[in-house]
C-alpha cells in the first residue's frame, strides 16, 4: 500500500477516482492518497467495506451489508449501487442441442450445495459432471472432497478444474447447470455464465439468484428436493435462445459499462453541486433497466 500510495500521489489530479477492491485491506491506501481523490469500492461481494462510494454485485448483497453494518432497520445510501458483474458473450458460445448430462461447476464444498445436485441427478438416473476445486481424491466413481464430504455413484463424473474452451463446451452442452448454494450468494457468476451459453440454471431461491435467474424462463429456483427434481425434468422446456439473449442484455460488457458510466457521473457531480446537480441534457434513466 505504501508504494502504491506514493506512485498514485505523484500522478493524481483532483477529482480522480481511486477504484479499489478487497475492502478494508485497501483503506490505508485510500487514506494515504488523500481527500482530493475519491475512493470507490467496486465488485463488492464481501462484508468488510469502508468507502462511502460502493458498487455491490447484487441488491441482495447490498441489503445484507446494510443490515450487518447498520443494524436491523438501516437507512439506504444514495451512493451505494448494485451493478452486476460483466461477461464477454464471445467467451460463451451457445447451442440449442444439449448433451446427456447436468453440470455442477464450482468449489466442491457443502455450502455450495453439491449434495443437492448429486441427489437430484441420482433420483432421475441422470449423469452429473462435477468440475471445480476442492477434491482430495477420486477412486472410480467415489469422490472425496478436501472439506470431508464424499460423493459416490455411477451417475457421477469428476473432470477437475476447467477453463477456456473446455469450460465453454461443458456449459453450452449441459442440459442445465446446478447452482444450489446454501449461503446467501453475493452474485454466483456461474449462473450467468451458463445463461450466456444458452443453458438453463437450477438454483436456490435466495441471494443473487433471485436477480439473475428468471424463474420459469432462464431456469428454476427451488426450495425442496421435489422442486429440484421437477426442475431438472423440465429444463428442456426452456428456450436456449431467450436464455442467452437475456443474459447478454443484462450482463454483457456493452450493457454493464453504461451502468458504470451513470454511476461515475453521479460521483463526479459531488465535486460540484453534488446531489442537487441537474443535467438538462439527460435523455433517459435506462441504467437501472432489466431486460
Identify the role of each PLM range.
Residues 1-291:
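Catalytic cores of nucleotide-sugar-dependent glycosyltransferases that transfer UDP/GDP/TDP-activated
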Amino acid at each position: 500500500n505504501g508504494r502504491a500510495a506514493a506512485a498514485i500521489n505523484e500522478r493524481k489530479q483532483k477529482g480522480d477516482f481511486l477504484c479499489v477492491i478487497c475492502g478494508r485491506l485497501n483503506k490505508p491506501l485510500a487514506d494515504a492518497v488523500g481527500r482530493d481523490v475519491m475512493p470507490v469500492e467496486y465488485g463488492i461481494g464481501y462484508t468488510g467495506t469502508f468507502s462511502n462510494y460502493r458498487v455491490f454485485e447484487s441488491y441482495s448483497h447490498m441489503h445484507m451489508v446494510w443490515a450487518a453494518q447498520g443494524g436491523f432497520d438501516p437507512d439506504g445510501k444514495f451512493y451505494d449501487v448494485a451493478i452486476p458483474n460483466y461477461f464477454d458473450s464471445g467467451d460463451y458460445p451457445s447451442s440449442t442441442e444439449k448433451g446427456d448430462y447436468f453440470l455442477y461447476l464450482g468449489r466442491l464444498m457443502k455450502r455450495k450445495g453439491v449434495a443437492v445436485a448429486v441427489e437430484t441427478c441420482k433420483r432421475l438416473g441422470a449423469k452429473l459432471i462435477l468440475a471445480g476445486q476442492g477434491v482430495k481424491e477420486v477412486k472410480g466413481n467415489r469422490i472425496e472432497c478436501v472439506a470431508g464430504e464424499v460423493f459416490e455413484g455411477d451417475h457421477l463424473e469428476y473432470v477437475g478444474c476447467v477453463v477456456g474452451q473446455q469450460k465453454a463446451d461443458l456449459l453450452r452442452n449441459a442440459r442445465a447447470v446446478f447452482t444450489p448454494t446454501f449461503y446467501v450468494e453475493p452474485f454466483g457468476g456461474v449462473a450467468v455464465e451458463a445463461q450466456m451459453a444458452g443453458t438453463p440454471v437450477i438454483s436456490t431461491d435466495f441471494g443473487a439468484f433471485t436477480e439473475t435467474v428468471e424463474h420459469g424462463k432462464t431456469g428454476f429456483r427451488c426450495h425442496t428436493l421435489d422442486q429440484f427434481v421437477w426442475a431438472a425434468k423440465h429444463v428442456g422446456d426452456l428456450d436456449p435462445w431467450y436464455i442467452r439473449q437475456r443474459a447478454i442484455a443484462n450482463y454483457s460488457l456493452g450493457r454493464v459499462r453504461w451502468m458504470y458510466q451513470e454511476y461515475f457521473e453521479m460521483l463526479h457531480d459531488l465535486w460540484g453541486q453534488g446531489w442537487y446537480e441537474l443535467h438538462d441534457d439527460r435523455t433517459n434513466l435506462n441504467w437501472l433497466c432489466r431486460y
